[in-house]
Regions:
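Conserved beta-strand positions in repeat-built beta-propeller and related beta-rich domains
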Residues: 1, 33-39, 94-100, 144-150, ...
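Blade-edge beta-strand/turn elements of extracellular beta-propeller
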Residues: 2-16, 61-81, 109-129, 153-168
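Structural signal for beta-propeller blades
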Residues: 41-43, 62-64, 102-105, 153-154, ...
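Short loop/turn segments immediately following beta-strands, especially the blade-tip
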Residues: 107-115, 197-205
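Predominantly five- to eight-bladed beta-propeller fold
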Residues: 47-63, 199-215
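Asp-box/WD-like beta-propeller blade repeats and closely related beta-sheet repeat scaffolds
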Residues: 1-53, 58-61
Length: 215
């Protein structure tokens, strides 16, 4: 959106093929934009078949894309069912929530230009038995990863060790750090929005660095 309020399409296809259903997006301070494109929610007659872009010119989804500052689009990494995205405070790691059928958080290591140089499973949420899936994903200012999952919002330290689960009256779907000090957690659940004050603020959005702001 420009100063006049005009909305423009940033990217509408990959190599001539339509996206499946872009889901989440995050911006790096180097100008790269990352977004997820899951699959499996198209009409049956639009499911992929062998070919460069599948039936009805649809890609099969299940990818994390990287949009470079010059407009070049590439596949950063394939993923079973990529959903939420978050960047570590130093922006060297991109976290990806994998929703179905395996419930993981992937950690993608990035070089200075924002290309993938390594990848690993950061956390395994498959052992949870309560309602909830990896979807909303955020990082706080000391690098801890917050992710919706079975039972609530999972809080995981930078080494991948589970610290605990923040529980809510109903299933958590997505959330954000907000307020003047980024110490209020706003959580969207199935029927309501909840708030919780936390001791450690959320990590400021990377674009604040370009503007010389801290919150």
């Amino acid at each position: 959106m420009g100063p006049e309020g005009k909305v423009e399409m940033l990217v509408g296809n990959y190599r001539g093929g339509r996206f499946n259903r872009p889901n989440d997006v995050i911006c790096h301070s180097n100008g790269c934009i990352y977004f997820t494109d899951p699959d499996k929610r198209r009409p049956y007659d639009e499911r992929e078949i062998p070919g460069p872009a599948g039936e009805n010119n649809l890609w099969d989804g299940a990818r994390v894309y990287r949009l470079a500052p010059d407009g070049g689009l590439s596949v950063l990494a394939p993923c079973e069912y990529p959903n939420g995205l978050a960047l570590s405070p130093d922006e060297r790691t991109l976290y990806v929530a994998n929703t179905r059928s395996s419930q993981y958080i992937h950690a993608i290591k990035l070089d200075a230009a924002g290309h993938m140089v390594g990848r690993s499973i950061f956390a395994d949420l498959n052992e949870g038995t309560e309602p909830g899936i990896p979807d909303g994903l955020k990082v706080d200012s000391i690098g801890r990863v917050y992710c919706t999952g079975p039972g609530g919002i999972w809080v995981i330290d930078p080494n991948g060790t589970l610290i605990g689960v923040i529980r809510w009256p109903e299933q958590a779907v997505n959330f954000a750090f907000g307020g003047p000090d980024l110490r209020t957690l706003f959580c969207c659940a199935h029927t309501s929005v909840y708030t919780l004050r936390v001791k450690v603020p959320g990590n400021p959005h990377p674009w604040y660095k370009l503007r010389g702001e801290t919150t």
